[in-house]
């Protein structure tokens, strides 16, 4: 890899993640690319997560924790972290997921070779208790705006963005699917999302999460189509059918 070592800001919203947050933080501490800062925004956790975060903030000066005064949702938490981020590159990692140790290094090299602004990678699934599942979510070579409307394949935990090219990023203030809306917003501006088809992250299937409830996820996707993207009913319906087909394929 080039000797240039850019700073990557890791954006992590946290809420009642006591059982998982240590795995998440350690996956960042173990990165082969050492030039990162991790900005964790805690959304009023009540389960002891804050006590754990305070300890990690003392252990490594690259870890910064922000405590929200009222429960506001992941969009507000991520935006607060993005406001404080100092890195040219930003990467997203939720408080129950993990990265492979060379994730940042490999993805940075991938982006610099292509001079691309927006990239994502493949990832694997794990059970709620951390047991690896025999399932790999592949990353297509590239996605345009129209592609992403039909195939919501981009895993938030795999995304890296070059803000020198995209400008500042802010997620829409909606409770769920704000990540999808953000990717669509970038792609709509003409950027292409480039996929690195290598497993560089692990996504935890938490039983009470929106993503684990397929019906809720589908409803929120429809909301993004109609209320955020303002798609005509017929186009939204067509995109939704394609989304549903691809969602089924992804789980096979």
Curated annotation (Swiss-Prot):
Transmembrane segments: none annotated. Induction: By phosphate starvation, via the PhoP/PhoR two-component regulatory system. Its EC number is 2.4.-.-. The keyword Transferase applies. Keywords: Cell wall biogenesis/degradation, Glycosyltransferase, Stress response, Transferase. GO terms for biological process: cell wall organization; teichuronic acid biosynthetic process. It holds the Pfam family Glycos_transf_2. InterPro entries: Glyco_trans_2-like, Nucleotide-diphossugar_trans. It is an enzyme of class 2 (transferase). GO terms for molecular function: glycosyltransferase activity; hexosyltransferase activity. Pathway: Cell wall biogenesis; teichuronic acid biosynthesis. SUPFAM superfamilies: Nucleotide-diphospho-sugar transferases. Belongs to the glycosyltransferase 2 family. The nature of the anionic polymer present in the cell wall of B.subtilis depends on phosphate availability. Under phosphate-replete growth conditions teichoic acids are present, whereas under phosphate-depleted conditions, at least part of the wall teichoic acid is replaced with teichuronic acid, a non-phosphate containing anionic polymer. The synthesis of teichuronic acid is accompanied by degradation of teichoic acid and reutilization of liberated phosphate for other cellular processes such as nucleic acid synthesis. PANTHER family: GLYCOSYLTRANSFERASE (PTHR22916), UDP-GLCNAC:BETAGAL BETA-1,3-N-ACETYLGLUCOSAMINYLTRANSFERASE-LIKE PROTEIN 1 (PTHR22916:SF3). This is Putative teichuronic acid biosynthesis glycosyltransferase TuaG. It comes from Bacillus subtilis (strain 168). The gene is tuaG.
């Amino acid at each position: 890899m080039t000797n240039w070592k850019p700073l990557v800001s890791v954006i992590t919203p946290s809420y009642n993640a006591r059982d998982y947050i240590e795995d998440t933080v350690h996956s960042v501490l173990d990165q082969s690319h050492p030039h990162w800062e991790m900005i964790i925004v805690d959304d009023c956790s009540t389960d002891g997560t804050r006590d754990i975060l305070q300890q990690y903030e003392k252990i490594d000066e690259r870890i910064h924790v922000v405590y929200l005064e009222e429960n506001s949702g992941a969009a507000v938490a991520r935006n607060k972290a993005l406001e404080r981020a100092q890195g040219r590159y930003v990467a997203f990692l939720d408080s129950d997921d993990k990265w492979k140790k060379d994730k940042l290094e490999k993805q940075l090299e991938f982006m610099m070779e292509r001079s691309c602004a927006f990239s994502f990678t493949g990832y694997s699934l794990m059970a709620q208790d951390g047991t690896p599942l025999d399932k790999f979510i592949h990353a297509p070579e590239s996605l345009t705006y129209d592609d992403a409307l039909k195939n919501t394949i981009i895993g938030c935990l795999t995304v890296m963005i070059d803000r020198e090219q995209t400008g500042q990023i802010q997620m829409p203030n909606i409770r769920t699917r704000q990540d999808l809306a953000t990717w669509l917003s970038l792609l709509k501006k003409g950027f292409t999302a480039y996929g690195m088809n290598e497993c560089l992250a692990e996504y935890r299937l938490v039983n009470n999460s929106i993503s684990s409830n397929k019906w809720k996820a589908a409803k929120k996707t429809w909301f993004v189509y109609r209320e955020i993207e303002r798609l005509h009913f017929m186009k939204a319906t067509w995109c939704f059918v394609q989304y549903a087909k691809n969602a089924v394929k992804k789980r096979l």
